[in-house]
Amino acid sequence: MESITISQLKNWKRNKKKFAAITAYDFSFSRLFSNCGIPVILIGDSLGMTIQGHTSTLPVKIEDIAYHTKAVRKGAPNTFLISDLPFMSYYDTKQALKNTAKIIRSGANMIKMEGGKWLIEIVRELSNRLILICGHIGLIPQSFHYLGGYKVQGRKENDANKLIDEALLLEEAGINMLILECIPEKLAKKITESLSIPVIGIGSGKNTDGQILVMHDLLGITEGKTPSFTKNFLLESDSIQKAIQKYIYEVEHSIYPSKKHSF
């Protein structure tokens, strides 16, 4: 696979070519995903739960993300890598710049930050330094205490309008990509069509430019109950490779997510 760039991902949006993304945390799985044709991998702070065994993403440190980013980059040299800035690692511009440098040096193409209007000045400062940024709005796991748990966001009209405003403000400030998590399908469609940057959905319906799943959910190895928007692709496949290829096919052809995976 040739190296994937942000320009290519933006072209896919313009040409209405959907793409599949996935989380990964190590060399072996990232190499497998890359060989299957996954163009975008997220080194997410979800590793706090899937790898470290915590009950949330909050204990994850910047050193954890840097370590796993290095491993994933070795396995997927040409894949577009997005790495999370974990909880309280970007509470001001100085801290955000310092920790972004660590992550980019570890091999990421882009950093991801959760939040809305309060992030604007930080986004603008990073963008002015030509750093690629992925925003993340809707259900933002680093703020699950404030949100009252892991709940769908944007159901009420005023909440939906707030998310639309935040998406537009973040794009204006300089984000290059946006993740929408657990918002109604119609709202995700409106936001996606309002932005010129690629929009990736998780639990937000099929009308975004791309989809992302946590690898453990996709492969059916998550401990306990999984979110209703996930799908175990390994159930219908006889190998991990075929499960990933099926996931890619269903995303590219708007089969997944279906209505039962959406809100």
From Swiss-Prot:
EC number assigned by the record: 2.1.2.11
**InterPro entries from the xrefs?**
Pantoate_hydroxy_MeTrfase, Pyrv/PenolPyrv_kinase-like_dom, Pyrv_kinase-like_dom_sf
Q: Which domain of life is it from?
A: Bacteria
Q: Give the Gene Ontology MF terms in alphabetical order.
A: 3-methyl-2-oxobutanoate hydroxymethyltransferase activity; magnesium ion binding
Cell compartments where the protein resides = Cytoplasm
What SUPFAM superfamilies would the database entry show? Phosphoenolpyruvate/pyruvate domain (SSF51621)
Alphabetically ordered keywords of this record: Cytoplasm, Magnesium, Metal-binding, Pantothenate biosynthesis, Transferase
The protein's annotated catalytic reaction(s) are:
3-methyl-2-oxobutanoate + (6R)-5,10-methylene-5,6,7,8-tetrahydrofolate + H2O = 2-dehydropantoate + (6S)-5,6,7,8-tetrahydrofolate
Which pathway? Cofactor biosynthesis; (R)-pantothenate biosynthesis; (R)-pantoate from 3-methyl-2-oxobutanoate: step 1/2
Q: Required cofactors, per record?
A: Mg(2+)
Establish whether keyword tRNA-binding is in the entry: no
Q: Where does 3-methyl-2-oxobutanoate bind?
A: D45, S46, D84, K112
Note accompanying the cofactor annotation: Binds 1 Mg(2+) ion per subunit.
The residues that the entry says bind Mg(2+) are D45, D84, E114
Q: Where is the active site?
A: E181
A Gene Ontology biological process term: pantothenate biosynthetic process
Q: What is the stated purpose of this protein?
A: Catalyzes the reversible reaction in which hydroxymethyl group from 5,10-methylenetetrahydrofolate is transferred onto alpha-ketoisovalerate to form ketopantoate.
What HAMAP family does UniProt report for this protein, alphabetically? PanB
| Assembly and interaction partners | Homodecamer; pentamer of dimers.
NCBIfam families cross-referenced by the UniProt entry: panB, PRK00311.1
Protein's UniProt name: 3-methyl-2-oxobutanoate hydroxymethyltransferase
Q: Which organism is it from?
A: Buchnera aphidicola subsp. Acyrthosiphon pisum (strain Tuc7)
Show the taxonomic lineage: Bacteria, Pseudomonadati, Pseudomonadota, Gammaproteobacteria, Enterobacterales
Gene assigned in the entry: panB
